[in-house]
Amino acid sequence: ITATRILKRSIDARQRTIFVNLKVRAYIREMPKDDEYEHTIYNKVEGKPQVIVVGAGPGGLFAALRLIELGLRPVVIERGKDVRERKKDLAQISREHTVDPESNYSFGEGGAGAYSDGKLYTRSKKRGNIDKILNVFCQHGASTAILVDAHPHIGTDKLPRVIENMRNTIIECGGEVHFQTRMEALIIENDEVKGIETNTGKTFLGPVILATGHSARDVYRWLAANNVTIEAKGIAVGVR
């Protein structure tokens, strides 16, 4: 054996004796690659067809990065503020008990999870390429420990920097990110979405991805009022 690499790490603390469980890959007469994670290549997309992404939470940010991979130019529209300015508004909630309806725990860059500890859990094994998601986080500044920990955790103190780096990648590749810009309506012609109208008076044209999370009730009310088909997500409820 010439080298080893940890693939998965977990802690079993159910008994008095604590066990650290490791899943390890052994290399025989060869060495592992130097890179601890896989790098995704993001090429320039200036002048490419644009796609409007409404919401700069995890869904919106990852959608924008995926669009760049596919050679499309993302234009991200976020009703709240950037992740650093948003932190000031969260402090106001605690100190002054005042809530900015557009910049709070639900709205703003990073989404509802940006300031809720940064845990990265999923119980499902069928939700796509989870390893790639973790690699993208590492590429933008997260600790490589999340690649092996059974319960990966970025941390609230580190997550804002990771989110900023993801935004910078989008902009450096030729995409756009617009803060304090709220979608007011979809532009629909002949039953086809052509773009969006915003509270700033500016319209953005192109195919639209709604990554609006669970708190943007105004969006869902507009969709329902304009006969756009919407479906409730199914939920599994356990019974004892």
Where on the chain are the PLM-derived regions?
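Residues forming the flavin
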Residues: 1-20, 24-240
